[in-house]
């Protein structure tokens, strides 16, 4: 748009690249940031650069971390015989909020979606298989309750069953078509409690 200076338009474009942010919201965020004191803008930009520079994926589970392995994988009080498989790192935050699960996680970084051109080789399934050893008794599949999540869950069940590990799926207290990120703690706790074997 010609009525904004190039620097403002560029900032709007960058905000609009974020998921769920359209042009109008990006415009509001840009104008908000421009009205902040310079020191706050500097702190924000430094925090962004520092997070991007120091945060990496845990070599064990695939969660975001600044230390490898992450705090969950390195915690001796976590039950390492149970692995909860989730689609994205943000889903760990949702599961941890319920304070009902004491196992470890495996982040797939996606799901199987033929419509989007994502197959089993595009998510972290080989890494999951490598983690299945004699010490793992159960794999809880907590993928989102949508078509892609169900396809992913069934595929995981198919590849893990021959390894002799119990594979369960969280119960559908979580609304079909919804994301774990938006489920409340009680719903997630009930879904975890009512998981079923696949």
From Swiss-Prot:
Pfam families named among the record's database cross-references: RecR_C, RecR_HhH, RecR_ZnF, Toprim_4
Top-level taxonomic group: Bacteria
Record keywords, A-Z: DNA damage, DNA recombination, DNA repair, Metal-binding, Zinc, Zinc-finger
Ubl conjugation keyword on record: no
Keyword Metal-binding belongs to the record: yes
InterPro entries, A to Z: DNA_Rcmb_RecR (IPR000093), Rcmb_RecR (IPR023627), Rcmb_RecR_Znf (IPR015967), TOPRIM_dom (IPR006171), TOPRIM_RecR (IPR034137)
Zinc finger (C4-type) residue numbers: 58-73
Any one GO BP annotation for this protein: double-strand break repair
Function: May play a role in DNA repair. It seems to be involved in an RecBC-independent recombinational process of DNA repair. It may act with RecF and RecO.
HAMAP family listed in its UniProt record: RecR
Family statement drawn from the similarity comment of this UniProt entry: Belongs to the RecR family.
Official protein name in the record: Recombination protein RecR
